[in-house]
Amino acid sequence: MSAHNRGTELDLSWISKIQVNHPAVLRRAEQIQARRTVKKEWQAAWLLKAVTFIDLTTLSGDDTSSNIQRLCYKAKYPIREDLLKALNMHDKGITTAAVCVYPARVCDAVKALKAAGCNIPVASVAAGFPAGQTHLKTRLEEIRLAVEDGATEIDVVINRSLVLTGQWEALYDEIRQFRKACGEAHLKTILATGELGTLTNVYKASMIAMMAGSDFIKTSTGKETVNATFPVAIVMLRAIRDFFWKTGNKIGFKPAGGIRSAKDSLAWLSLVKEELGDEWLKPELFRIGASTLLSDIERQIYHHVTGRYAAYHDLPMS
């Protein structure tokens, strides 16, 4: 991943001037979604590229060490080898970008990946995921413990009430403490945009998170009623672009929640390419949080190679 974002001083004068043009954002989202994202002959290559952006995730109450092992195996071998050979991509080292688990499962993931002989990063959700409604002291300790157990990326959740009540300085201070607790681990800040009320709040929260030292800003926990949407993403991507123009710091973007199909993944790649350019299309600056997306990508690649759709037994690890 890229170098840490060390953050900037809080600039409330900038925050106070922000006002998002909601109808214009919706029009832009409709324009992008109406286009064909990738020509058919290029789809397999783009789908393989999408695989390398996935934070392969399991965040279930019934997670065990055995299904964490399966997750890590799939992260290392995301696409069946014979399919990769058919595309002449079997020797390119294609893996997912990371695995993402609960803090209590970090040790399991680190152990499984070490046994598999690969250096895929382990990301952990933390800071009272998914609601962010536990005591700050507890949230900070959760981050520290996840890092201590071997997580090199931490996906924290913000306290949404600070956004809804306009407590921007308190939000900045909270994320600064998260940044410090992460140490050398990279910080991804989940805004839970479906619970922020307005697109203006989404932009302001994005900017505060970047000022406070977030290496990535992330749309959602995946547990909200409304998760990653194009209008929200456009606002966040414009905030990333504005922050880059102002500071020279490139901040990553991670949509998560409801991204399940190969077609969805291509649409998200196209959106990031349109709004930020090709330089953001690398795992250091773009991730997709997903648990079932990889299965559909592998099915589509199977169809591209064989001309038929896979039966369940054809892709048993999906």
Curated annotation (Swiss-Prot):
Q: What is its EC number?
A: 4.1.2.4
In its keyword annotation, does this UniProt entry include Lyase? yes
> What is annotated as the active site?
155, 218, 254
For this protein, the record's InterPro entries field holds: Aldolase_TIM, DeoC, DeoC/FbaB/LacD_aldolase
Q: What SMART domains is this protein classified in?
A: DeoC
Biological process (GO) annotations? Answer: carbohydrate catabolic process; deoxyribonucleoside catabolic process; deoxyribonucleotide catabolic process; deoxyribose phosphate catabolic process; pentose-phosphate shunt
**What catalytic reaction does the record list?**
2-deoxy-D-ribose 5-phosphate = D-glyceraldehyde 3-phosphate + acetaldehyde
Q: List the GO cellular component terms.
A: cytosol; extracellular region; ficolin-1-rich granule lumen; nucleoplasm; secretory granule lumen
Q: In which pathway does it act?
A: Carbohydrate degradation; 2-deoxy-D-ribose 1-phosphate degradation; D-glyceraldehyde 3-phosphate and acetaldehyde from 2-deoxy-alpha-D-ribose 1-phosphate: step 2/2
Expression (tissue specificity):
Mainly expressed in liver, lung and colon.
* Principal place of residence: cytoplasm
- Ranges annotated as spanning the membrane: none
A GO molecular-function annotation: deoxyribose-phosphate aldolase activity
The UniProt keywords, alphabetically, are: Cytoplasm, Lyase, Nucleus, Schiff base
Localization of this protein: Cytoplasm; Cytoplasmic granule; Nucleus
Q: What does this protein do?
A: Catalyzes a reversible aldol reaction between acetaldehyde and D-glyceraldehyde 3-phosphate to generate 2-deoxy-D-ribose 5-phosphate. Participates in stress granule (SG) assembly. May allow ATP production from extracellular deoxyinosine in conditions of energy deprivation.
Quaternary structure?
Interacts with YBX1.
Indicate the family of this protein: Belongs to the DeoC/FbaB aldolase family. DeoC type 2 subfamily.
| Protein name, per record | Deoxyribose-phosphate aldolase
